[in-house]
Protein backbone atom coordinates (compact mmCIF):
# COMPACT_ATOMS: atom_id res chain seq x y z
CA UNK A 1 0.00 0.00 0.00
CA UNK A 2 2.95 2.37 0.52
CA UNK A 3 3.92 1.95 -3.13
CA UNK A 4 0.34 2.72 -4.11
CA UNK A 5 0.33 5.92 -2.05
CA UNK A 6 3.63 7.00 -3.61
CA UNK A 7 2.25 6.28 -7.05
CA UNK A 8 -0.86 8.36 -6.40
CA UNK A 9 1.25 11.25 -5.05
CA UNK A 10 3.44 11.24 -8.18
CA UNK A 11 0.35 11.06 -10.34
CA UNK A 12 -1.21 14.02 -8.55
CA UNK A 13 2.02 16.03 -8.91
CA UNK A 14 2.16 15.30 -12.62
CA UNK A 15 -1.50 16.17 -13.03
CA UNK A 16 -1.08 19.45 -11.14
CA UNK A 17 1.88 20.38 -13.29
CA UNK A 18 -0.11 19.63 -16.41
CA UNK A 19 -3.01 21.67 -15.08
CA UNK A 20 -0.76 24.70 -14.43
CA UNK A 21 0.22 24.67 -18.04
CA UNK A 22 -3.42 25.41 -18.83
CA UNK A 23 -5.20 25.33 -22.11
CA UNK A 24 -4.90 28.17 -24.63
CA UNK A 25 -7.94 30.35 -24.80
CA UNK A 26 -9.79 30.16 -28.01
CA UNK A 27 -9.62 33.27 -30.10
CA UNK A 28 -11.83 34.32 -32.92
CA UNK A 29 -10.76 32.78 -36.16
CA UNK A 30 -10.16 36.14 -37.77
CA UNK A 31 -7.58 37.33 -35.19
CA UNK A 32 -5.52 34.14 -35.04
CA UNK A 33 -2.31 34.00 -36.94
CA UNK A 34 -1.70 31.01 -39.14
CA UNK A 35 -0.80 28.11 -36.83
CA UNK A 36 2.51 26.43 -37.06
CA UNK A 37 2.69 22.95 -38.50
CA UNK A 38 1.89 21.47 -35.11
CA UNK A 39 -0.53 24.15 -33.94
CA UNK A 40 -3.25 21.67 -33.06
CA UNK A 41 -0.95 19.70 -30.75
CA UNK A 42 -1.24 21.93 -27.62
CA UNK A 43 -5.06 21.88 -27.87
CA UNK A 44 -5.09 18.11 -28.14
CA UNK A 45 -2.66 17.76 -25.23
CA UNK A 46 -4.62 20.12 -23.01
CA UNK A 47 -7.89 18.36 -23.88
CA UNK A 48 -6.41 14.98 -23.09
CA UNK A 49 -4.94 16.20 -19.85
CA UNK A 50 -8.18 17.83 -18.75
CA UNK A 51 -10.22 14.78 -19.74
CA UNK A 52 -7.75 12.45 -18.08
CA UNK A 53 -7.72 14.59 -14.96
CA UNK A 54 -11.53 14.51 -14.79
CA UNK A 55 -11.60 10.74 -15.20
CA UNK A 56 -8.92 10.23 -12.62
CA UNK A 57 -10.69 12.53 -10.20
CA UNK A 58 -13.76 10.36 -10.65
CA UNK A 59 -11.90 7.04 -10.36
CA UNK A 60 -9.64 7.96 -7.47
CA UNK A 61 -12.18 9.84 -5.41
CA UNK A 62 -11.57 7.33 -2.63
CA UNK A 63 -8.10 8.83 -2.00
CA UNK A 64 -9.83 12.00 -0.70
CA UNK A 65 -6.96 14.40 -1.55
CA UNK A 66 -7.87 17.97 -2.44
CA UNK A 67 -7.33 19.19 -5.93
CA UNK A 68 -5.54 22.36 -6.56
CA UNK A 69 -7.64 24.84 -8.51
CA UNK A 70 -6.81 25.38 -12.13
CA UNK A 71 -4.99 28.69 -12.51
CA UNK A 72 -5.59 30.73 -15.58
CA UNK A 73 -2.31 30.65 -17.39
CA UNK A 74 -1.25 32.52 -20.49
CA UNK A 75 -1.04 30.78 -23.78
CA UNK A 76 1.93 28.48 -23.83
CA UNK A 77 4.16 28.14 -26.81
CA UNK A 78 3.06 25.29 -29.00
CA UNK A 79 4.48 21.97 -27.81
CA UNK A 80 7.76 23.25 -26.58
CA UNK A 81 8.15 22.77 -22.83
CA UNK A 82 4.79 21.11 -22.01
CA UNK A 83 5.54 18.10 -24.20
CA UNK A 84 8.87 17.54 -22.51
CA UNK A 85 7.45 17.83 -19.00
CA UNK A 86 4.53 15.59 -19.91
CA UNK A 87 6.84 13.03 -21.42
CA UNK A 88 9.09 12.99 -18.35
CA UNK A 89 6.10 12.69 -16.03
CA UNK A 90 4.59 9.86 -18.03
CA UNK A 91 7.89 8.01 -18.16
CA UNK A 92 8.16 8.32 -14.40
CA UNK A 93 4.55 7.13 -14.06
CA UNK A 94 5.22 4.12 -16.28
CA UNK A 95 8.27 3.20 -14.22
CA UNK A 96 6.34 3.42 -10.96
CA UNK A 97 3.46 1.39 -12.37
CA UNK A 98 5.86 -1.30 -13.57
CA UNK A 99 7.37 -1.56 -10.09
CA UNK A 100 3.93 -1.68 -8.53
CA UNK A 101 2.79 -4.27 -11.04
CA UNK A 102 5.83 -6.46 -10.31
CA UNK A 103 5.20 -6.21 -6.56
CA UNK A 104 1.42 -6.60 -6.56
CA UNK A 105 1.08 -9.03 -9.48
CA UNK A 106 0.24 -12.04 -7.36
CA UNK A 107 -2.18 -10.03 -5.18
CA UNK A 108 -4.00 -8.72 -8.24
CA UNK A 109 -4.27 -12.18 -9.82
CA UNK A 110 -5.54 -13.69 -6.60
CA UNK A 111 -8.14 -10.95 -6.13
CA UNK A 112 -9.23 -11.07 -9.76
CA UNK A 113 -9.53 -14.88 -9.68
CA UNK A 114 -12.21 -14.65 -6.98
CA UNK A 115 -14.67 -12.87 -9.29
CA UNK A 116 -16.40 -14.17 -12.38
CA UNK A 117 -14.85 -13.25 -15.68
CA UNK A 118 -18.08 -11.57 -16.75
CA UNK A 119 -17.51 -8.79 -14.19
CA UNK A 120 -14.07 -8.02 -15.56
CA UNK A 121 -15.30 -8.02 -19.13
CA UNK A 122 -18.18 -5.69 -18.27
CA UNK A 123 -15.85 -3.39 -16.27
CA UNK A 124 -13.37 -3.16 -19.13
CA UNK A 125 -16.13 -2.45 -21.64
CA UNK A 126 -17.54 0.30 -19.39
CA UNK A 127 -14.08 1.84 -18.92
CA UNK A 128 -13.44 1.80 -22.66
CA UNK A 129 -16.80 3.44 -23.30
CA UNK A 130 -16.20 6.10 -20.62
CA UNK A 131 -12.77 6.89 -22.07
CA UNK A 132 -14.24 7.10 -25.56
CA UNK A 133 -16.92 9.52 -24.37
CA UNK A 134 -14.58 11.70 -22.28
CA UNK A 135 -11.90 12.13 -24.94
CA UNK A 136 -12.75 14.79 -27.54
CA UNK A 137 -12.73 13.87 -31.17
CA UNK A 138 -9.87 15.46 -33.07
CA UNK A 139 -10.17 15.93 -36.79
CA UNK A 140 -7.46 14.29 -38.81
CA UNK A 141 -4.55 16.57 -39.55
CA UNK A 142 -2.84 16.69 -42.87
CA UNK A 143 0.47 17.09 -41.09
CA UNK A 144 2.24 14.12 -39.50
CA UNK A 145 2.03 14.19 -35.72
CA UNK A 146 5.23 13.91 -33.73
CA UNK A 147 5.71 10.86 -31.58
CA UNK A 148 5.22 11.29 -27.82
CA UNK A 149 4.81 8.98 -24.84
CA UNK A 150 1.31 7.47 -24.35
CA UNK A 151 -0.35 7.01 -20.95
CA UNK A 152 -2.96 4.52 -22.14
CA UNK A 153 -1.29 1.30 -20.94
CA UNK A 154 -0.30 2.76 -17.60
CA UNK A 155 -3.67 4.31 -16.84
CA UNK A 156 -5.55 1.21 -17.91
CA UNK A 157 -3.42 -0.94 -15.61
CA UNK A 158 -4.00 1.46 -12.74
CA UNK A 159 -7.75 1.59 -13.44
CA UNK A 160 -7.94 -2.18 -13.48
CA UNK A 161 -6.09 -2.41 -10.18
CA UNK A 162 -8.36 0.18 -8.55
CA UNK A 163 -11.47 -1.59 -9.85
CA UNK A 164 -10.19 -4.87 -8.38
CA UNK A 165 -9.56 -3.24 -5.01
CA UNK A 166 -13.00 -1.62 -5.08
CA UNK A 167 -14.71 -4.96 -5.83
CA UNK A 168 -12.68 -6.59 -3.09
CA UNK A 169 -13.81 -3.94 -0.59
CA UNK A 170 -17.47 -4.42 -1.61
CA UNK A 171 -17.06 -8.18 -1.24
CA UNK A 172 -15.82 -7.75 2.34
CA UNK A 173 -18.94 -5.70 3.21
CA UNK A 174 -21.57 -8.22 2.08
CA UNK A 175 -24.68 -8.46 4.32
CA UNK A 176 -24.49 -10.91 7.20
CA UNK A 177 -27.70 -12.72 6.19
CA UNK A 178 -25.89 -15.18 3.94
CA UNK A 179 -23.45 -17.88 5.03
CA UNK A 180 -19.94 -16.79 6.02
CA UNK A 181 -17.60 -16.31 3.08
CA UNK A 182 -14.34 -18.24 2.92
CA UNK A 183 -11.30 -16.17 3.89
CA UNK A 184 -9.29 -14.66 1.07
CA UNK A 185 -6.03 -16.33 0.26
CA UNK A 186 -2.99 -14.70 1.78
CA UNK A 187 -0.68 -12.94 -0.68
CA UNK A 188 2.30 -14.96 -1.80
CA UNK A 189 5.79 -13.78 -2.18
CA UNK A 190 7.13 -12.66 -5.51
CA UNK A 191 8.17 -15.54 -7.68
CA UNK A 192 6.05 -18.09 -5.74
CA UNK A 193 2.62 -18.27 -7.43
CA UNK A 194 -0.18 -20.04 -5.55
CA UNK A 195 -1.09 -23.58 -6.67
CA UNK A 196 -3.86 -23.73 -9.28
CA UNK A 197 -5.90 -26.14 -7.12
CA UNK A 198 -6.18 -23.65 -4.26
CA UNK A 199 -7.12 -20.81 -6.63
CA UNK A 200 -9.88 -22.83 -8.34
CA UNK A 201 -11.22 -24.07 -5.00
CA UNK A 202 -11.31 -20.55 -3.60
CA UNK A 203 -13.05 -19.25 -6.72
CA UNK A 204 -15.65 -22.03 -6.55
CA UNK A 205 -16.30 -21.44 -2.86
CA UNK A 206 -16.67 -17.71 -3.51
CA UNK A 207 -19.14 -18.28 -6.35
CA UNK A 208 -21.17 -20.67 -4.18
CA UNK A 209 -21.16 -18.14 -1.37
CA UNK A 210 -22.36 -15.38 -3.70
CA UNK A 211 -25.10 -17.67 -5.03
CA UNK A 212 -26.30 -18.52 -1.53
CA UNK A 213 -26.26 -14.86 -0.54
CA UNK A 214 -28.31 -13.92 -3.60
CA UNK A 215 -30.84 -16.69 -2.89
CA UNK A 216 -31.11 -15.60 0.74
CA UNK A 217 -31.80 -12.01 -0.30
CA UNK A 218 -34.56 -13.26 -2.61
CA UNK A 219 -36.20 -15.20 0.22
CA UNK A 220 -35.13 -18.68 -0.93
CA UNK A 221 -33.96 -20.76 2.06
CA UNK A 222 -30.46 -22.17 1.59
CA UNK A 223 -29.78 -23.49 5.07
CA UNK A 224 -28.98 -27.19 5.31
CA UNK A 225 -31.86 -29.39 6.50
CA UNK A 226 -29.65 -32.04 8.04
CA UNK A 227 -27.22 -34.68 6.88
CA UNK A 228 -28.26 -37.37 4.42
CA UNK A 229 -28.54 -40.81 6.02
CA UNK A 230 -26.84 -42.37 2.99
CA UNK A 231 -24.07 -40.01 1.84
CA UNK A 232 -23.74 -38.06 5.13
CA UNK A 233 -23.73 -34.74 3.23
CA UNK A 234 -25.85 -31.63 3.93
CA UNK A 235 -29.33 -31.45 2.39
CA UNK A 236 -30.30 -28.05 0.95
CA UNK A 237 -33.16 -28.82 -1.47
CA UNK A 238 -35.88 -31.43 -1.29
CA UNK A 239 -35.66 -33.76 1.69
CA UNK A 240 -37.21 -37.13 2.57
CA UNK A 241 -37.72 -37.76 6.28
CA UNK A 242 -38.06 -41.44 7.19
CA UNK A 243 -36.84 -43.89 9.81
CA UNK A 244 -35.87 -40.99 12.08
CA UNK A 245 -33.38 -39.55 9.58
CA UNK A 246 -33.26 -37.19 6.61
CA UNK A 247 -32.34 -38.31 3.09
CA UNK A 248 -31.70 -36.88 -0.34
CA UNK A 249 -34.63 -38.05 -2.51
CA UNK A 250 -32.23 -39.81 -4.86
CA UNK A 251 -30.44 -41.55 -1.97
CA UNK A 252 -33.53 -43.01 -0.22
CA UNK A 253 -33.41 -46.41 -1.95
CA UNK A 254 -34.72 -49.92 -1.37
CA UNK A 255 -32.14 -52.06 0.41
CA UNK A 256 -33.01 -55.01 -1.81
CA UNK A 257 -33.32 -53.75 -5.40
CA UNK A 258 -32.02 -50.11 -5.03
CA UNK A 259 -35.28 -48.65 -6.36
CA UNK A 260 -35.97 -45.01 -5.43
CA UNK A 261 -38.55 -44.79 -2.63
CA UNK A 262 -39.04 -41.00 -2.70
CA UNK A 263 -42.81 -40.79 -3.18
CA UNK A 264 -43.92 -44.41 -2.71
CA UNK A 265 -44.74 -46.59 0.26
CA UNK A 266 -42.10 -48.75 1.86
CA UNK A 267 -41.59 -51.24 4.69
CA UNK A 268 -38.94 -51.23 7.40
CA UNK A 269 -36.95 -54.23 8.60
CA UNK A 270 -34.09 -53.88 11.10
CA UNK A 271 -33.78 -50.16 10.34
CA UNK A 272 -33.52 -50.62 6.56
CA UNK A 273 -36.18 -49.56 4.01
CA UNK A 274 -37.60 -52.04 1.50
CA UNK A 275 -40.04 -51.68 -1.37
CA UNK A 276 -43.21 -53.82 -1.08
CA UNK A 277 -42.00 -56.43 -3.58
CA UNK A 278 -38.67 -57.04 -1.83
CA UNK A 279 -40.21 -56.96 1.63
CA UNK A 280 -42.93 -59.52 0.86
CA UNK A 281 -40.53 -61.72 -1.07
CA UNK A 282 -37.98 -61.78 1.75
CA UNK A 283 -39.92 -61.52 4.99
CA UNK A 284 -43.60 -62.32 4.38
CA UNK A 285 -44.89 -65.79 5.46
CA UNK A 286 -45.62 -68.30 2.71
CA UNK A 287 -48.99 -69.84 1.97
CA UNK A 288 -49.21 -73.54 2.82
CA UNK A 289 -51.13 -74.23 -0.41
CA UNK A 290 -49.45 -72.14 -3.17
CA UNK A 291 -46.14 -71.32 -1.40
CA UNK A 292 -46.44 -67.65 -2.42
CA UNK A 293 -45.87 -64.70 -0.03
CA UNK A 294 -48.96 -63.51 1.82
CA UNK A 295 -49.47 -59.75 1.33
CA UNK A 296 -52.77 -58.92 3.04
CA UNK A 297 -55.15 -61.11 5.06
CA UNK A 298 -53.86 -64.36 6.45
CA UNK A 299 -55.27 -67.49 8.10
CA UNK A 300 -53.12 -69.35 10.61
CA UNK A 301 -54.05 -73.01 11.11
CA UNK A 302 -52.40 -76.40 11.46
CA UNK A 303 -49.07 -74.75 12.29
CA UNK A 304 -48.78 -72.84 9.01
CA UNK A 305 -50.14 -69.76 7.20
CA UNK A 306 -52.66 -69.61 4.37
CA UNK A 307 -54.27 -67.18 1.99
CA UNK A 308 -57.96 -67.00 2.99
CA UNK A 309 -59.01 -68.21 -0.46
CA UNK A 310 -56.55 -71.10 -0.30
CA UNK A 311 -57.62 -72.41 3.12
CA UNK A 312 -60.32 -74.80 1.89
CA UNK A 313 -61.17 -78.47 1.81
CA UNK A 314 -58.55 -80.47 0.00
CA UNK A 315 -61.18 -82.92 -1.21
CA UNK A 316 -63.97 -80.76 -2.65
CA UNK A 317 -62.21 -77.35 -2.78
CA UNK A 318 -65.04 -75.55 -0.99
CA UNK A 319 -64.20 -72.90 1.64
CA UNK A 320 -64.98 -73.78 5.20
CA UNK A 321 -68.23 -72.46 6.58
CA UNK A 322 -69.40 -71.96 10.11
CA UNK A 323 -69.00 -75.66 10.94
CA UNK A 324 -65.22 -75.32 10.73
CA UNK A 325 -62.85 -77.95 9.45
CA UNK A 326 -61.39 -81.31 10.37
CA UNK A 327 -57.75 -82.29 10.12
CA UNK A 328 -56.28 -85.52 8.85
CA UNK A 329 -52.52 -85.98 8.40
CA UNK A 330 -51.96 -82.20 8.43
CA UNK A 331 -54.54 -81.51 5.71
CA UNK A 332 -57.84 -79.69 6.27
CA UNK A 333 -61.19 -81.21 5.27
CA UNK A 334 -64.74 -80.00 5.47
CA UNK A 335 -67.05 -81.89 7.81
CA UNK A 336 -68.90 -83.72 5.10
CA UNK A 337 -65.81 -84.97 3.28
CA UNK A 338 -63.97 -85.79 6.46
CA UNK A 339 -66.81 -87.96 7.74
CA UNK A 340 -67.27 -89.43 4.32
CA UNK A 341 -63.63 -90.37 4.03
CA UNK A 342 -62.48 -91.11 7.54
CA UNK A 343 -65.48 -91.52 9.90
CA UNK A 344 -66.39 -95.08 11.10
CA UNK A 345 -69.17 -96.75 9.13
CA UNK A 346 -72.37 -98.25 10.42
CA UNK A 347 -72.62 -101.97 9.66
CA UNK A 348 -76.32 -101.64 9.03
CA UNK A 349 -76.62 -98.58 6.73
CA UNK A 350 -72.97 -98.09 5.78
CA UNK A 351 -73.27 -94.42 6.73
CA UNK A 352 -70.75 -92.52 8.87
CA UNK A 353 -71.30 -92.62 12.57
CA UNK A 354 -71.39 -89.08 13.95
CA UNK A 355 -72.58 -89.35 17.52
CA UNK A 356 -73.74 -92.40 19.52
CA UNK A 357 -73.10 -95.85 18.27
CA UNK A 358 -73.37 -99.51 19.27
CA UNK A 359 -70.46 -101.84 19.03
CA UNK A 360 -71.56 -105.42 18.41
CA UNK A 361 -70.56 -108.39 16.30
CA UNK A 362 -67.13 -106.74 15.75
CA UNK A 363 -68.74 -103.76 14.06
CA UNK A 364 -70.24 -100.37 14.82
CA UNK A 365 -73.92 -99.63 14.47
CA UNK A 366 -76.16 -96.66 14.67
CA UNK A 367 -78.62 -97.25 17.54
CA UNK A 368 -81.45 -97.13 15.03
CA UNK A 369 -79.71 -99.55 12.71
CA UNK A 370 -79.02 -102.28 15.29
CA UNK A 371 -82.27 -104.29 14.87
CA UNK A 372 -83.30 -107.73 13.74
CA UNK A 373 -82.16 -108.12 10.22
CA UNK A 374 -85.34 -110.04 9.31
CA UNK A 375 -88.20 -108.13 10.94
CA UNK A 376 -86.29 -104.87 11.66
CA UNK A 377 -87.68 -104.90 15.19
CA UNK A 378 -85.47 -103.45 17.90
CA UNK A 379 -84.13 -105.84 20.41
CA UNK A 380 -86.06 -105.73 23.66
CA UNK A 381 -84.00 -105.91 26.80
CA UNK A 382 -80.80 -105.42 24.85
CA UNK A 383 -80.46 -109.11 23.98
CA UNK A 384 -80.14 -110.45 20.47
CA UNK A 385 -79.20 -113.61 18.66
CA UNK A 386 -76.51 -113.93 16.05
CA UNK A 387 -76.68 -116.09 13.04
CA UNK A 388 -74.01 -115.97 10.37
CA UNK A 389 -72.84 -112.53 11.60
CA UNK A 390 -76.30 -111.02 11.57
CA UNK A 391 -78.26 -109.87 14.61
CA UNK A 392 -81.66 -111.57 14.87
CA UNK A 393 -84.49 -111.69 17.30
CA UNK A 394 -85.21 -114.95 19.07
CA UNK A 395 -87.95 -116.10 16.74
CA UNK A 396 -86.01 -115.41 13.56
CA UNK A 397 -82.91 -116.85 15.08
CA UNK A 398 -84.71 -120.17 15.80
CA UNK A 399 -86.41 -119.94 12.46
CA UNK A 400 -83.09 -119.66 10.72
CA UNK A 401 -81.80 -122.59 12.70
CA UNK A 402 -85.04 -124.68 12.46
CA UNK A 403 -85.66 -124.74 16.21
CA UNK A 404 -89.25 -123.50 16.19
CA UNK A 405 -92.09 -125.75 17.24
CA UNK A 406 -93.96 -126.83 14.12
CA UNK A 407 -97.26 -126.75 16.00
CA UNK A 408 -97.18 -123.47 17.99
CA UNK A 409 -94.43 -121.69 16.11
CA UNK A 410 -92.55 -120.86 19.27
CA UNK A 411 -88.93 -121.59 19.87
CA UNK A 412 -88.11 -124.90 21.42
CA UNK A 413 -85.78 -124.15 24.30
CA UNK A 414 -85.98 -127.33 26.39
CA UNK A 415 -86.76 -130.88 25.45
CA UNK A 416 -87.92 -131.29 21.93
CA UNK A 417 -89.20 -133.92 19.61
CA UNK A 418 -87.64 -134.11 16.18
CA UNK A 419 -89.87 -135.78 13.65
CA UNK A 420 -90.85 -135.32 10.07
CA UNK A 421 -87.84 -133.03 9.61
CA UNK A 422 -89.18 -130.60 12.17
CA UNK A 423 -89.02 -129.93 15.86
CA UNK A 424 -91.88 -129.97 18.34
CA UNK A 425 -92.46 -129.28 21.94
CA UNK A 426 -93.09 -132.65 23.60
CA UNK A 427 -96.62 -131.58 24.45
CA UNK A 428 -97.28 -130.32 20.92
CA UNK A 429 -96.35 -133.50 19.05
CA UNK A 430 -99.85 -135.06 18.87
CA UNK A 431 -102.05 -137.07 16.49
CA UNK A 432 -103.52 -134.96 13.82
CA UNK A 433 -106.96 -136.66 14.09
CA UNK A 434 -107.47 -137.40 17.81
CA UNK A 435 -104.92 -134.92 19.20
CA UNK A 436 -103.48 -137.39 21.61
CA UNK A 437 -99.80 -136.92 22.47
CA UNK A 438 -97.57 -139.25 20.67
CA UNK A 439 -95.42 -139.78 23.72
CA UNK A 440 -94.59 -143.40 23.11
CA UNK A 441 -92.72 -142.47 20.03
CA UNK A 442 -94.70 -144.57 17.59
CA UNK A 443 -96.78 -142.79 14.93
CA UNK A 444 -97.74 -143.01 11.33
CA UNK A 445 -97.13 -140.31 8.80
CA UNK A 446 -99.54 -139.32 6.09
CA UNK A 447 -99.03 -136.16 3.98
CA UNK A 448 -96.34 -134.93 6.42
CA UNK A 449 -98.78 -135.19 9.29
CA UNK A 450 -98.39 -137.49 12.28
CA UNK A 451 -101.21 -139.98 13.21
CA UNK A 452 -101.52 -142.43 16.00
CA UNK A 453 -101.79 -146.06 15.04
CA UNK A 454 -105.53 -146.53 15.69
CA UNK A 455 -106.50 -143.33 13.87
CA UNK A 456 -104.29 -144.16 10.92
CA UNK A 457 -105.86 -147.60 10.55
CA UNK A 458 -109.26 -146.20 11.04
CA UNK A 459 -108.78 -143.49 8.46
CA UNK A 460 -106.50 -145.07 5.95
CA UNK A 461 -106.59 -148.73 6.98
From Swiss-Prot:
Residues 1-240 are annotated as: Interaction with PTK2B/PYK2. Residues 83-136 are annotated as: Interaction with PTK2/FAK1. Ubiquitously expressed. Higher expression is detected in lung and spleen. Expression decreases during pregnancy in mammary glands. Expressed in all brain areas, with higher levels in cerebellum, prefrontal cortex and hypothalamus. Expressed in smooth muscle, myoepithelial cells and platelets (at protein level). Preferentially expressed in mesenchymal versus epithelial cells (at protein level). InterPro entries: Paxillin_TGFB1I1_LIM_dom1 (IPR047075), PDZ-LIM_domain (IPR050604), Tgfb1i1/Leupaxin/TGFB1I1 (IPR017305), Znf_LIM (IPR001781). Residues 226-285, 286-343, 344-403, 404-461 form the LIM zinc-binding domain. A motif (LD motif 4) lies at residues 203-215. GO terms for biological process: cell fate commitment; epithelial cell differentiation; fat cell differentiation; morphogenesis of embryonic epithelium; negative regulation of fat cell differentiation; positive regulation of epithelial to mesenchymal transition; positive regulation of transforming growth factor beta receptor signaling pathway; positive regulation of ubiquitin-dependent protein catabolic process. Phosphorylated by gonadotropin-releasing hormone-activated SRC. This is Transforming growth factor beta-1-induced transcript 1 protein. It comes from Mus musculus (Mouse). The lineage of its organism: Eukaryota, Metazoa, Chordata, Craniata, Vertebrata. The gene is Tgfb1i1.
Amino acid sequence: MEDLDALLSDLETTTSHMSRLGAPKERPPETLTPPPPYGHQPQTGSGESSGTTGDKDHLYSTVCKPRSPKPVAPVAPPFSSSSGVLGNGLCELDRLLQELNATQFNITDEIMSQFPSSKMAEGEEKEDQSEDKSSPTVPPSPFPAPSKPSATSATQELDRLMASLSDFRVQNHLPASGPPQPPAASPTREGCPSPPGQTSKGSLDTMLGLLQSDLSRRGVPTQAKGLCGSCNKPIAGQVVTALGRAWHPEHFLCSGCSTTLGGSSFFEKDGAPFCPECYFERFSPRCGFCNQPIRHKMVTALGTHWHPEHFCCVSCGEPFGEEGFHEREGRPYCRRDFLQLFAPRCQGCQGPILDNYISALSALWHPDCFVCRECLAPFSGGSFFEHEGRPLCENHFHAQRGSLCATCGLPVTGRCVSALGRRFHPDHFTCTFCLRPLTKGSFQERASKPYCQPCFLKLFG
